[in-house]
Amino acid sequence: MGQSPNGSTYSEIPSKYILVQGNADLKDGWVFPRIWTTQKTRVANVGDIIMTVRAPAGSVGKTSYNVVLGRGVSGVKGNEFIYQSLVKMDIDGYWKKLAAGSTFESINCDDVNEANLMVPKDIDEQDRIGELLSILDNLITLHQRKLEKLQNIKKSMLNKMFI
């Protein structure tokens, strides 16, 4: 679990460390830097999985940076299979059910550590499954971008037609 640096060390200007605080710092399954800090508290390394533990709990992303973890996130060591399993748990509402009933939606370290993941013992099998799901994610992203381009073209044409 993360530990927030002193607020006086935050900046929107890129500096020493990228700070990941929560869902606002994750975009399309990846850490998207928006806040920096000069204070190093708890960290996650390149390739680690970042999971939000406060409202909304359970959103996940990967990091291609070394980052400082704020109080609203946790760093998880794991391969693509573990990442995809955590994504599925989020989609299925697993974390929301755990957080239900509290005033402020959150999960704790025990909730994460005790999560029941069905993981093949064979690392090669995990890697193959993770790679296949990653390929599908990439394909979905490509189609989403094409859809956005087509929607922008349509919007532009409609604007020109009705001016």
Residue ranges, per PLM feature:
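Feature detects amphipathic, helix-rich regulatory segments
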Residues: 1-163
